[in-house]
Each structure stands twice: as structure tokens, then as C-alpha cells.
């Protein structure tokens, strides 16, 4: 079989392409935690489609359910019509996810991607409250369309909008200044003081762990205080769980450990189970003031994704999957702490939570060098943070012990090689 010429992508695809530059090979096959390129080289996937493949590649049960559905001429496109797959998904999501957690949410299908759920959340918050402004947080990432981009912190991404991004006030995230300073004192002062110039917003939007902004994990007490502030001022709390949700931090929703109940929750990426496009927006029933068709979209009813998403929920029918994630999370955390201790040259700090972790290095350019070295050794992972200062571990939640150990070993080999060859960019 002839191999695809990389020149095809260089000549015909837009310069905006990104990941194919970081991982310069042509992939052709994937299974579980493994990927293969056209040359037959095997890679361990510690990237998981930026969080869209929490269950790994080509899960057997999801694949069978999808193939059977297609072979039976199951409906593919249906806008937001009532279909068998949608009904099954809604019922199972209620029974397996919402009811056991005592969560009473309506489910909205806003479109196929993460930015769609964020846009609908912002729109609904403004409609419900009659207010225009939103409070977002430093280093947050919420999407690439105008509304979600307006609450995103990254200056490079924001410049791409081409217009002023307005009606948003950015406040400091937990530990943005220092561990000793509670940034919510600052936020609350702005709300209390009529001379601050900050209007009471419609909503606050945040990630409990910032996936693109540096794997920054908010402390439990910080999240709990955010909820109290929102309740005090009648502000809706939106948790963007697009990347941190569906088990990535150790529980299905990333906010469960904090014991908070957001008014609105954004889910996408792995909610579809198989890597198929699907997004949902959850909100308290009393917020459901939409008129029929007031917010719509052609591809908001992906029946193929409903089929695989429903099958994926089987992982959560008891607590065994969650316990396995948390046990492996401890293994990963211990490994990262060991790396920082044994290789002081990298000036590292362990970041994140669960299967959403990494090491931030104070050595300029080091995180990028680690990902490049790891890729050459057969491991796929990316960087995070405003200066790409974090190398980020996002293994599939379904990875077995052998795969996890192999991947972690490659990371250590990569760091060791860089340290020994003095491949550190010294400041």
C-alpha cells in the first residue's frame, strides 16, 4: 500500500493546521491506547484527542453498537427530532449519571462541539438574568467562536477574533497571583464596590481544572466560595466540563469532589464516547425558558454519537470504573512527583488532577523538548499553558497497567536524555 505524501498537507491544507506539525507522521490505525502510522510505527497515546477519547480508540462495545445501528439503516441525521437513539441516551444519562448524583438538570443539544455548548450557556444566562456581562477567569479556555472566545484568556487565540471581545470581565483564577492570596477577595470587592466599574454579571464561567491554560486545578475551598458568591449576588455558575468532565479528573463531573452544584454545565468531547461529535448543555429546570427553536443548529442531533454515548455510559453503571481511574491517577501522580524530585534540573512543579496532569517547567522551552523527544520514542502528548511551559499527560481512562507503565517510562527516558545531553534551554 502506497504511503501518503506529507506534501499533500503542506500544499493543500491551510496554514492553520496545528497538531500535524507537532506529530509529523501520517496516522492510519488506532486501538485502545495505541496508534500506528503508515510506516507501521506504534505510538502510545497520552493525548486522547485533547480529551475526546477518554475511552480510548475504537472501543469494541461502542464500535459494535454503532456498526449494528448503521447496518440496520438507523437514522443518521434528524435535527432535533425525536429518535430512538436520542431517547435511549436521555434515559440512560438520567438513570446512570444524574439520578445517582441527585442532580436535576434539563438536557439541551446545542450542536456538535464544545464551543456550541459554551455559546448556548452564555446565551441562556443572559436571557434568564437580563444582564449582559460575564465573569471569566485568567487562563481559561472555552472555545474559538466569538462568544466562547470572549471568555477565553489566551491572547494569541483572542487576536484571531478580529473584533473587540466585549461584555466580559476577567478575574484571577485560583493561585494566579500566589498560593497565599485568595483571588476571590479581589473578585468580591469588585462586586461590592459601586465604584469598581464592574456590573453584576449574568454568570461566572470556569473550568475546575484548566486544560489548555496550564493544567491549573482550583482548590476545593476556592470552588465552594465561588458558588457562595454566585448565590449571594444571583449570578449563574457555569462549569465548563468539556475537557475536565466524563471522568478525566477522577469522577464523572469534575466538580463532584467539591460538593458544588452548578446552575449550568457544559459537556462535549468524550460525552460521545467514541470520538464522534456531540455536545450537551445541562441546566436547572427553572432556567429552561427557551422558546421552541430559539436556539437551534443543523447538527445538534448526532444519532451515531447517541448510540456510542449510550454504550459508553455502561462504564458508569457501578463504581468500579471510577475506582480504577482513581487508583491509576495515584500511580501517575506518584510518578510525576518522583520525576520532579529526581531531576531538579527541570525546575518542575506537578500540576492537575486525576488523568488531567502534567509538569510545569521553569526552564524555557523544556516542555516542548520533552514532547518532541517522547514523540520520537513513540509517545504522543502535548504542551499546555500560556507559554507552553507544561507537558501534559492525558492517557485514555481505559489504559491498562502495562500501557501506563510503558508511557510513563518513555517520559522519564525523554527527560533523562535531555538532561544528560544538556538539552535544556538555560535561562
Swiss-Prot record:
Question: What EC number(s) would the UniProt record show?
Answer: 2.6.1.76
Q: What class of enzyme is it?
A: transferase
- Which InterPro entries does the record cross-reference, listed alphabetically? Aminotrans_3, Aminotrans_3_PPA_site, Dat, Ectoine_EctB, PyrdxlP-dep_Trfase, PyrdxlP-dep_Trfase_major, PyrdxlP-dep_Trfase_small
Recorded hits in Pfam families, A to Z, give:
Aminotran_3
Q: Which UniProt keywords apply?
A: Aminotransferase, Pyridoxal phosphate, Transferase
Q: Which residues carry this modification: N6-(pyridoxal phosphate)lysine?
A: 269
Give the transmembrane ranges. Answer: none
The molecular function terms of the Gene Ontology recorded here are: diaminobutyrate-2-oxoglutarate transaminase activity; diaminobutyrate-pyruvate transaminase activity; pyridoxal phosphate binding
Q: Which GO terms describe its biological process?
A: ectoine biosynthetic process
Q: Name the pathway.
A: Amine and polyamine biosynthesis; ectoine biosynthesis; L-ectoine from L-aspartate 4-semialdehyde: step 1/3
Cofactor(s) in the UniProt record: pyridoxal 5'-phosphate
Q: Which family does the similarity line name?
A: Belongs to the class-III pyridoxal-phosphate-dependent aminotransferase family.
According to UniProt, the name of this protein is Diaminobutyrate--2-oxoglutarate transaminase
Amino acid at each position: 500500500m502506497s504511503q501518503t505524501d506529507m506534501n499533500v498537507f503542506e500544499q493543500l491544507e491551510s496554514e492553520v493546521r496545528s497538531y500535524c506539525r507537532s506529530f509529523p507522521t501520517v496516522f492510519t490505525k488506532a486501538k485502545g491506547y495505541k496508534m500506528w502510522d503508515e510506516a507501521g510505527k506504534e505510538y502510545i497515546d497520552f493525548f486522547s484527542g485533547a480529551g475526546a477519547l477518554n475511552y480510548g480508540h475504537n472501543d469494541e462495545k461502542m464500535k459494535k453498537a454503532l456498526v449494528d445501528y448503521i447496518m440496520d439503516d438507523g437514522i443518521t441525521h434528524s435535527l432535533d427530532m425525536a429518535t430512538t437513539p436520542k431517547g435511549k441516551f436521555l434515559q440512560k444519562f438520567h438513570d446512570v449519571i444524574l439520578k445517582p448524583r441527585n442532580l436535576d438538570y434539563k438536557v439541551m443539544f446545542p450542536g456538535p462541539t464544545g464551543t456550541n455548548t459554551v455559546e448556548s450557556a452564555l446565551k441562556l444566562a443572559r436571557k434568564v438574568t437580563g444582564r449582559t456581562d460575564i465573569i471569566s477567569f485568567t487562563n481559561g479556555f472555552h472555545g474559538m467562536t466569538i462568544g466562547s472566545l470572549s471568555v477565553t484568556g489566551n491572547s494569541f487565540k483572542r487576536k484571531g477574533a478580529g473584533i473587540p471581545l466585549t461584555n466580559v470581565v476577567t478575574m484571577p483564577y485560583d493561585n494566579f497571583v500566589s498560593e497565599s492570596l485568595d483571588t476571590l477577595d479581589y473578585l468580591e470587592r469588585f462586586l461590592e464596590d459601586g465604584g469598581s466599574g464592574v456590573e453584576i454579571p449574568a454568570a461566572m464561567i470556569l473550568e475546575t481544572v484548566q486544560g489548555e491554560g496550564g493544567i491549573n486545578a482550583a482548590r476545593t475551598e476556592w470552588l465552594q466560595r465561588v458558588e457562595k458568591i454566585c448565590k449571594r449576588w444571583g449570578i449563574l455558575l457555569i462549569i465548563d466540563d468539556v475537557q475536565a468532565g466524563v471522568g478525566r479528573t477522577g469522577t464523572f463531573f469534575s466538580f463532584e469532589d467539591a460538593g458544588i452544584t452548578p446552575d449550568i454545565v457544559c459537556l462535549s468531547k468524550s460525552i460521545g464516547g467514541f470520538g464522534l461529535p456531540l455536545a450537551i448543555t445541562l441546566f436547572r429546570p427553572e432556567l429552561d425558558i427557551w422558546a421552541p427553536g430559539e436556539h437551534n443548529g443543523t447538527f445538534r442531533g448526532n444519532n451515531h454519537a447517541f448510540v456510542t454515548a449510550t454504550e459508553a455510559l455502561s462504564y458508569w453503571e457501578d463504581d468500579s470504573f471510577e475506582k480504577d481511574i482513581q487508583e491509576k491517577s495515584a500511580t501517575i501522580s506518584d510518578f510525576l512527583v518522583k520525576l520532579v524530585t529526581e531531576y531538579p534540573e527541570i525546575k518542575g512543579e506537578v500540576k492537575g488532577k486525576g488523568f488531567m496532569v502534567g509538569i510545569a517547567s521553569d526552564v524555557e522551552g523544556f516542555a516542548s523538548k520533552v514532547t518532541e523527544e517522547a514523540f520520537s520514542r513513540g509517545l504522543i502528548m502535548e504542551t499546555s499553558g500560556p507559554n507552553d511551559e507544561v507537558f501534559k499527560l492525558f492517557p485514555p481512562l481505559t489504559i491498562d497497567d502495562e500501557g501506563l507503565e510503558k508511557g510513563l517510562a518513555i517520559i522519564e527516558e525523554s527527560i533523562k536524555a535531555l538532561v544528560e545531553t544538556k538539552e535544556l534551554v538555560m535561562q
